[in-house]
Amino acid sequence: MTTIRGGSRRASLPALALLGVLLGACHSDDNAQVNTLPGFVSGNVRKTAYDGASDDLLTAGLGKTGLGSDTRPGFANPAQPTAAELRRLAIYSNYRALVDITPNGGYGRFWGPNVDLAGNDTLGEGKIAGTEYLAYSDDGSGRKNVTLLVQVPASFDPANPCIVTATSSGSRGVYGAIAAAGEWGLKRGCAVAYNDKGGGNGAHEIGTGVVTLIDGTLASASSAGSASLFTASESSSALAAFNSAFPNRYAYKHAHSQQNPEQDWGRVTLQAVEFAYWALNEQFGPAIDGARHGVRYRPGDITTIAASVSNGGAAALAAAEQDTRGWITAVVVGEPQINVRMTPGVTVEQGGVPAPSFGRPLADYATLANLLQPCAAAAVAAVGAPYLSALPVGLTQSIRVQRCATLAAAGLVSGADTASQANDALAQLHAAGYLADSDLLQAPMWDSQAIPAIAVTYANAYTRSRVTDNLCNFSFATTNSVTGAVAPPATSPMTSLFGAGNGVPPTNGINLVFNGASGGVDHRLATPDASFAGAFCLRQLWTANQLGIGANVDAVRVAANLQRKPAIIVQGRSDALVPVNHASRAYVAQNSATEGRASQLSFYEVTNGQHFDAFLSVPGFDTRFVPVHYYDEQALNLMWNHLKSGAPLPPSQVIRTVPRGGVPGAAPALSTANLPPIVQSPGSNAITVNAGVIDVPL
């Protein structure tokens, strides 16, 4: 690894001279003759070369076989893993978190390191040699510390340069989108510009004061200083008092940084692209005075596709909207969690009928779902839903009955019995914009804790709450595996957090707990109705506009103005985490009102597609749902052909897939019969978009 000294915060010119690495000691405009590090880069740039055999950019040396193995890579010393070991685990964990990793589900046949861009099994283990550049972006405070990472494959062609962004989905660390966008970019020979959006998988163990650094290794908060990925902002005395009252708790960057990082997702994605330009100029620019490099590539010189999924997809859209220097050429995103600033007259329709609700922000629909889903899961239409919980079935059923009863007692659902109360809860979700296509996913979205985790994390972020606030009596803690009560861990989860965590508890042994009269307990077990009081409190934050939540949500809304850039959005119709009415459909409708006929946006809605392809091996998911990732990759290929050969982008359309069927847990192998192509002439499947109105065929 080579260290390239950068920002003034941690480097001095004498030290640079001593080390003989004066490659970026000063910051200046990128139009200067000398290639200079962007001013937002803070501290050192770490440059590491990978040979494509023992280690590599895509699989961390694991290859297709290792990524597909259920045995995760270990540490030589479990108490003190190396940065390389943590990187390997992070790539393994994040790759598997975003795609179906089973052979029957398509891994190794439709996608995977061995599958080339034409869909053929020609790449063996799929290891990719190249170079990584790693650094922080910061505003000088030492508190932003957005992780930036650029991967430059050995196959990069300096004469035909390209960049693909891979902003992390969810609140994942910097490798979070390696399967969603990074893999395609590397196979295409493009540099890949990653960033963690300033909320990625940074934690602070309050009891010990341990924090993570940029490479996942650990340090005390006091010794790490501004090199910490995240340190809770409270004073040491305040944290000590909190730890005394609430031991074994953790602060998380997305939830507790008090910075509402989502408002900067577009900006930091643009910074990732600019950092990639610097890295490419550093690697391929002309040599100057034997030590420095000149500028070979200036803004707009490199074909750049802003890509990713979920939160990373939203970041790509926001970046394209904010781009004033020509960094981004085109956009391809999947299932974007995007909050749209809707204007009067914009409408979402399906089959010519206006949707009952559309364009709501996540703070609204997630807190509503968190309140109602445990009850709606008992509705008639949800019978037979996939079971996605480690809790005994009987306990889960009891939670559903009790949540319905409490909702009814509070006047929030109607009905004299559980069945009617559950049906009413589901009807309320329909009225709030959730499609009937996602009825069977209401239960697993809550049972898996995806919705509770999001509701709590984003409520904290949107209210700029501190860890010591215990917002709505929720906090993050280690717990007893049997009782769910807060308990000290046998081994600190911090050791492997960078490699195995996802940034939104429950994750890596850190759970979501409700702090009741008897102390903190797993939120599902704290009360018979699964912490209804906390869920209701979260909902009230939005409905009563408490603690500044409205203003902070407004700060993350986008205008849907892509500045005439060619763009593709892909989303599954059955998405129950990010409902399509509030995300993609709303964005496309608003874009048509904003850009009109100048818009170059196409939208592909995938029937039987839902948010988490990693769930597709779960019994009941395998028989009913198809991989949206397959269409994300097809969309990237379509965009590439459009940019490089002028091929027209297929118009907006519904893609009518065919579920695999069979027996839950033993569905037949995925085949092309399940995955019809995106076509140039969709006929009756065409989605019409005009003057702010989108109409999606039934």
Swiss-Prot record:
Q: Which reaction does it catalyse?
A: (3R)-hydroxybutanoate dimer + H2O = 2 (R)-3-hydroxybutanoate + H(+)
Pathway the protein takes part in: Lipid metabolism; butanoate metabolism
Q: Where is the active site?
A: 310 (charge relay system)
Task: Tell me which SUPFAM superfamilies the record gives.
Answer: alpha/beta-Hydrolases
Give the GO cellular component terms, alphabetically.
extracellular space
Keyword annotations: Hydrolase, Secreted, Signal
Location within or outside the cell: Secreted
- Please indicate if the UniProt record lists Nucleus as a keyword: no
Origin: domain of life: Bacteria
Q: What is its EC number?
A: 3.1.1.22
Main localization is secreted
Transmembrane regions listed in the UniProt entry? none
Task: Identify which top EC class this enzyme belongs to.
Answer: hydrolase
- What biological-process GO terms show up in the record? butyrate metabolic process
Query: Which HAMAP family would you find in this protein's record?
Result: 3HBOH
What this protein is reported to do is described as:
Participates in the degradation of poly-3-hydroxybutyrate (PHB). It works downstream of poly(3-hydroxybutyrate) depolymerase, hydrolyzing D(-)-3-hydroxybutyrate oligomers of various length (3HB-oligomers) into 3HB-monomers.
Task: Identify its protein family.
Answer: Belongs to the D-(-)-3-hydroxybutyrate oligomer hydrolase family.
| Protein name, per record | D-(-)-3-hydroxybutyrate oligomer hydrolase
